[in-house]
Regions:
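Exported/periplasmic ABC-transporter solute-binding proteins
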Residues: 1-198
Length: 198
């Protein structure tokens, strides 16, 4: 109905949305770090192994070179943008078998930190030393690897417009001018997101 100037999304626009004239303006990128309890000796998973853990096809760390311990699968609640992006990036939407679903990132971090054998996922910006980040296909989750595209678990933060930014009102153009300014980019980095390569 074109009553909104800017529509925010924590995922890429679909082809259907683009066909309706929406322009995908990526303003930031969020890396999704897979984390495990610090006692776990496994440091790297393939994308396929990660998908199999979350769908219940791999249930013990010994099958991945770790100790003989059940994998405790922790995730976010249904409707979470992080969960939606994580499952979509792995191609496992609506197939996950969670031992526990938690309503906030901090709770996932705390649960994985205190639960032996656990695995979870959080936004890169909250990653701390209470847990161990897992490499994905040999790539460490970091701002650098998200920015250069080598780390696969990442999602764009999009501000969609009806048509190109240059076709928008002066007020809308001013919003994007600020976002793309040095001050705007500093804010994006300060909140823990990665600025896209321009």
């Amino acid at each position: 109905s074109k009553t909104t100037d800017i529509g925010d999304s924590s995922r890429a626009l679909t082809d259907e949305e683009k066909a309706k004239g929406l322009e995908e303006n990526i303003v930031a990128i969020d890396g999704i770090a897979t984390i495990t309890n610090k006692s776990n000796k496994v440091t790297n998973l393939t994308k396929d192994q990660l998908a199999k853990i979350y769908t219940g096809q791999i249930t013990n760390w010994k099958d991945l070179g770790g100790q003989d311990e059940a994998i405790v699968v922790i995730g976010r609640e249904a409707g979470s943008g992080t969960r939606g992006a994580f499952e979509e990036l792995l191609g496992i939407e609506d197939q996950c078998q969670y031992a526990q679903e938690l309503n906030e990132t901090g709770a996932v971090l705390a649960k994985v930190a205190k639960t032996s054998g656990s695995i979870g996922y959080v936004s890169l910006d909250v990653l701390d030393d209470t847990v161990s980040p897992l490499q994905l296909d040999g790539v460490e989750p970091s701002e650098k690897t998200v920015k250069d595209g080598s780390y696969a678990l990442q999602r764009p933060f999009v501000m969609a417009t009806n048509g190109k930014i240059s076709e928008q009102s002066k007020q809308v153009q001013a919003v994007f001018d600020f976002i793309n300014s040095d001050d705007g980019q500093k804010i994006i980095e300060k909140v823990g997101l990665v600025t896209p390569n321009k």
